[in-house]
C-alpha cells in the first residue's frame, strides 16, 4: 500500500488551504528547504498531515524531545490509522556512557537500562521503512546516532513462504543467527518455542502478533499469525519475513572479516603505545580488546559492539556512521517540528560525544576506530537529509538562511486570537500572581508560570501551596513519562498551576491554560529571548480567555520584538475574523487523544483496561473502609504489595500503590 489515507472530520480552513498548496507545490518543484511559519493553535500538524497525504512520500518527523514526539505520534496515528505510523526514539530509560576521568583515575563502566517496548518500536520503524511506502516515522535527535547498516541488516533477514522446503534444524540455526533465543516456558519478544513440527516465533519488532510455522516433514505446510496471549489464530499467511533482534546483528562472514581488521588495528595501536612508554595503557587495551574478540567469535556479539561499527559496516575511517537516515528511501520527506530547537540539537551532539571518546582512546580503553561510533556531524546530516520542511512559530537563523520558501500560517480556523499581553511591575509579582491564580481557578481554568531558576521555582511552588493553591513543579530531573503525566494531570484538573523554567514552551498542547505568567521578563538572556517569550506566550493561545502577563520593571528589546510579533498576529487574525464573520471558539481536545502513545506508545489496550478495572476495584474497596484500624491494616497490605512490585521492577504498578497509600494516610488523618 502506498496511499496515505487521511482520516479526519475537518476540512482545511483559515490559512491552511493556501499553506498546504504552497508546500506541496514546493515539494513537487524540488525545493530542498521550506519553512512553515505557523502560530500556536493554527493546526500545523493537520497541515503537514495533508501535505503527506497529497505528496504520498515516506516521511520522517523530527521532534526536539520525547514528550513532543509522543504527542505527534498520537496525532499522526489518529490522522493515519490505516498507515504505518511508527515511533523511533532513544530506547534507554537510563544511560551512563563509559567514561574515564584522568584526574582521579576513575573509569566508569557503561551502564544502561533498555526499554524493551521502545526497542520493539524502533525495530518496527525500520521494518516499515524497508517494506512500505506509506510510513511516517516520528523521531527525536537520536535518529542521527549510529545504527547497524541497512545493507548488513537486510542480509540477515529470513523469508519463509508456505510450501518452502525447510529443514527444522536449519530454521532453528537461522533464528539463533538472528539472536532469537529458544524459550519453551516464557514466550516473549525475540524468542521461539518448538513443539514437535510446530515452531512458534515471536518477531522482535512485533507487539501484538506471533507467527506459527507448521512443518510436514521438511515442507512448510502452514504459516499463521496468532495472539501470543490467547493462542487464537488471527489469520493465515502466504509468506512472512523475520528481521533480526537487533540493528547490530551481523552475518558470520562479515564478523570474521571485521575481527581480522580489529586485530590489525590492535597490533598497530599497541606498538604505538609501547613506543610512547604507555605500558599500562597498552596492557589495558590488549586485555579489553581480546576479550571482546573472543566474545564476538563465540556469541556473534559483545558488550559495546557498537564501538567496532566501522569494521562491521565496512566503512572507511572518518566516514559518517549508518543511521536511521540510511534506511530512508530516496524520495523521503523530512519534517522538523519546532525547528528553532531541533536544528541546533543536531549540531550539538557530535562535539560532546567526541571529547569523551578521545579520552577513552588516549588512555587505552578503546581503539581509535571507536571514534567512528558517533552521531553524525552537522555537515554530514545536511548532506544526507532529504527534502525538508521546517515547522516553527519562531524560525531560527538556520531556517532563515536555508528557506527556499516561507509559508505563513498565522490565521487560526477557530478564530482564536493570540493572548493579550500585559506588563506589570516585577516588585509585587508574586502577590499579584496569587490574586490572578485565584481568579482563574474560580473559572476552572489552568495557569502556567515560568521562572528563571530552579530555586525560584521551588520557592514559588512552596509559597503557592502554603496559600491553598493546587500546584506542581515541572523540572529537568523529572523523567519523560512522569512529565507527560504531570501535563495530563494539569489538563484533567488534578491541580491548577504548573510552575517551570524552560519546559513550558514548544508544542505543549494545553487548551485549558488561560493564563501564562512570565516572572522577571526583563532579564535578557536565553530564557527571555524574543523566541522564548513568543513560544511561552503561545501556550495560552488555545484558550478563548488566553492572556499573558509579563512581570518587568523595564521593556527590553526581546520583550518589544515578542510583543510586536504577537500584536501583528493578533491584528491579522482579528481582520480575518471580521472579514469572514467568525466568532472565536475555544479548542476542546480529549486528553487521551493528545497523549496517545506518550507513556508507552502502542501498548496494549487490554493492559490499560485491566489496570483501569483494578483501579476501580481498589477505589471501591477503599470507600468501604471506615475505622482507623481498617485503614491501617489496608495500608500495611498495600505497602507489602508495593515493595514486592518494586523488587519485581514493576515500578508503574508500585507507584500506583504508593499513591493509594498516600490517599489512605490522608483519610487516616481526617478520621
From Swiss-Prot:
Give the residue interval(s) assigned to the motif Beta-hairpin: 91-114
**Residues that hold ATP according to the record:** 38-45
Gene3D superfamilies recorded for this chain? 6.10.140.240, P-loop containing nucleotide triphosphate hydrolases, UVR domain
Annotated GO biological process:
nucleotide-excision repair; SOS response
The UniProt record lists the keyword Signal = no
Q: Where is the composition biased (Basic and acidic residues)?
A: 614-624
Q: Does the keyword DNA damage apply?
A: yes
Q: Record's family?
A: Belongs to the UvrB family.
User: What is the documented function of this protein?
Assistant: The UvrABC repair system catalyzes the recognition and processing of DNA lesions. A damage recognition complex composed of 2 UvrA and 2 UvrB subunits scans DNA for abnormalities. Upon binding of the UvrA(2)B(2) complex to a putative damaged site, the DNA wraps around one UvrB monomer. DNA wrap is dependent on ATP binding by UvrB and probably causes local melting of the DNA helix, facilitating insertion of UvrB beta-hairpin between the DNA strands. Then UvrB probes one DNA strand for the presence of a lesion.
Q: Which NCBIfam families has this protein been placed in? A: PRK05298.1, uvrb
Q: What is this protein called?
A: UvrABC system protein B
Species per Swiss-Prot/TrEMBL record: Pseudomonas savastanoi pv. phaseolicola (strain 1448A / Race 6) (Pseudomonas syringae pv. phaseolicola (strain 1448A / Race 6))
Lineage here is: Bacteria, Pseudomonadati, Pseudomonadota, Gammaproteobacteria, Pseudomonadales
* Record gene name: uvrB
